[in-house]
Regions:
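S-adenosyl-L-methionine
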Residues: 1-66, 77, 82-115
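Short, glycine/acidic-enriched loop or turn micro-motifs at the edges of active sites
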Residues: 54, 78, 105, 126, ...
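Conserved SAM-binding motif I beta-strand of class I
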Residues: 70-75
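General small-molecule cofactor/ligand-binding pocket signal
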Residues: 97-99, 174-177
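S-adenosylmethionine
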Residues: 111-172, 178
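Core SAM-dependent methyltransferase catalytic element
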Residues: 175-188
């Protein structure tokens, strides 16, 4: 049985997107998604939105729906990537694309190739995939490779049991919001 989610706001509001297998991805809860876009909605227009660990591509789709200049969803799992590709294609939107790759490997080059600023949304599969026990340490190492002048904001969706430092290299924590077992940490 296939599972679906819907785009909750913007020009694609109500469009249905397929969700990949729950054994390989974990979809962002509606309340988290809604809160995030309420926070950044007025700031997203000139930005490229990059969704690391894309899953279904719903956050990238929602970003373009809400006016992002461009959105990119990166997904490593092949089956999930196929679903992401199909979801993005169904929106018939030229400024929305999917990349099959490991976010830890491809993100620095993708960000550095952007002409404008990037809003980076990182939602790793922290409680799903084997080998992700040290996911937050890997994320901090990834951030060390990014050029501050290319980044408008980095937002982590993470397990509420984990708390990021108030500073990660050149980026400072500017907002934190908890939603039960899931939290969002915003860095600029």
């Amino acid at each position: 049985m296939k599972l679906y989610t819907k785009i909750s706001s913007g020009k694609f509001k109500g469009k249905r997107l397929e969700l990949p297998s729950l054994s390989t991805t974990r979809s962002t809860k509606s309340i988290v998604k809604e809160s995030f876009f309420n926070v950044i909605r007025d700031e997203i227009y000139s930005l490229t939105f990059i969704e690391g660990f894309g899953g279904s591509g719903v956050m990238a789709s929602e970003a373009v729906s809400n006016g992002a200049r461009e959105a990119i969803a990166i997904e490593k799992d092949r089956a999930a990537f196929k679903i992401t590709q199909n979801n993005l294609a169904s929106l018939e939107c030229s400024n929305l694309k999917a990349i099959n790759g490991d976010s830890f490997s491809v993100l620095p080059d993708i960000i550095n190739s952007q002409s404008g600023k990037v809003l980076l949304y990182l939602d790793p599969p922290f409680d799903i995939r084997a080998g992700f026990d040290d996911i937050y340490e890997k994320l901090v190492n990834l951030i060390s490779q990014l050029k501050k002048e290319k980044i408008y904001m980095i937002v982590f969706e993470h397990n509420s049991d984990f708390k990021f430092s108030d500073e990660i290299f050149a980026f400072k924590l500017v907002k934190f919001k908890k939603f039960g077992a899931t939290s969002l940490s915003y860095f600029q």
